[in-house]
Every structure is written in structure tokens, then in C-alpha cells.
């Protein structure tokens, strides 16, 4: 499968990229900066194409390499999002956390809707923090959102 992967340089992506390559998938990796976490061998794989751009910027979804990669993809995996635990949660950083997730997701959806043959699947991941915290409760996708910033 040809997969467009966005935001795959974090915790999940660092495990998912090698797994997908071992299982015969061709990956187009989109990131704001060259992945320092991937090995040179991984980045030089014939089954990886690398695009350096900001997927949260709407203009990147209108023409060029990113829209071409989306058009060629069978599926999209979106793991994009500014890291949550690396900085203090100032009001400006909280806005970055929201924008890095919502703007990217909206850009993907809008671009997919404009394609004649959009990718067959979109996997969009966020964080369990959306549901809040509890020491005695299990959360599912049907659970209500928490009453805090992440919810």
C-alpha cells in the first residue's frame, strides 16, 4: 500500500514506520523538519519518500508535492501534533497544540474531498488526554470528553 504519513516522527511514528516498511508498504513521510529520530538506513530506503513542509499550512494542500503525494496514496495516517509535554502550557503554546492538530486534519479532509480518487482510508490519531483522567474508569471512543483544555 502507498501510505501518506503525517507527523510520524514522534512516539508512535518511530515504531510504526519501520513496522510498515517491514510489511512491504511504500511510505511518503511528511514532516516540518528532517526526522532526526530515523536512522540513515531507514531514510535511505527505496520505499520512503520524504517531504519537508508544514501540513498545518493550508496553502501546502492546494498544489505541489504534498497534494501530488495525497493523490497517489492509498491511505493516510495522520499523527500530527505539536508535542504536549515538551513546554509549559502557556496560552500561546496551547493554541499551537490545537492548531497543529486541527489545521492539519482540516487540510487533509479538504484536500481529499477535492480529489477525483481520494485515498481509501484515513487514520487520524490524537491522544487519550481528550477524555480526562480517572483511576477507576475505562475510556472508549464513546466516552464523553474531559472538562479541561485537552477535552
Annotated model-derived regions:
Residues 3-25:
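N-terminal Rossmann NAD(P)H-binding glycine-rich loop of SDR-like oxidoreductase domains
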Residues 6, 30, 76-80, 122-128:
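SDR active-site strand-loop-helix element
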Residues 11, 19, 52, 62, ...:
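Soluble, non-transmembrane catalytic domains of enzymes that act on hydrophobic metabolites at membranes
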Residues 15-16, 39, 87-88, 132-135:
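Short glycine-/acidic-enriched loop or helix-start segments at secondary-structure transitions
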Residues 30-35, 55:
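N-terminal Rossmann-fold cofactor-binding loop
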Residues 36-44:
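Short loop/helix-cap segments at secondary-structure boundaries that form the rim of catalytic
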Residues 44-107:
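NAD(P)H-binding glycine-rich loop region in Rossmannoid oxidoreductase-like domains
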Residues 94, 106-148:
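Conserved Rossmann-fold NAD(P)-dependent oxidoreductase catalytic core, especially the SDR/UDP-sugar
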Amino acid at each position: 500500500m502507498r501510505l501518506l504519513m503525517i507527523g510520524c516522527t514522534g512516539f508512535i511514528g518511530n515504531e510504526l514506520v519501520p513496522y510498515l516498511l517491514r510489511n512491504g508498504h511504500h511510505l511518503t513521510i511528511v514532516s516540518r523538519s528532517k526526522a532526526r529520530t530515523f536512522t540513515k538506513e531507514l531514510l535511505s530506503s527505496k520505499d520512503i519518500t520524504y517531504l519537508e513542509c508544514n501540513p498545518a499550512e493550508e496553502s501546502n494542500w492546494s498544489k505541489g508535492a504534498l497534494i501530488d503525494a495525497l493523490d497517489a496514496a492509498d491511505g493516510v495516517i495522520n499523527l500530527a501534533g505539536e508535542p504536549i509535554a515538551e513546554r509549559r502550557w502557556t496560552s500561546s503554546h496551547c493554541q499551537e497544540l490545537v492548531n497543529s492538530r486541527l489545521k492539519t486534519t482540516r487540510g487533509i479532509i479538504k484536500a481529499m474531498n477535492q480529489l477525483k480518487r481520494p485515498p481509501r482510508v484515513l487514520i487520524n490519531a490524537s491522544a487519550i488526554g481528550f477524555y480526562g483522567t480517572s483511576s477507576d474508569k475505562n475510556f472508549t471512543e464513546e466516552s464523553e470528553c474531559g472538562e479541561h483544555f485537552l477535552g
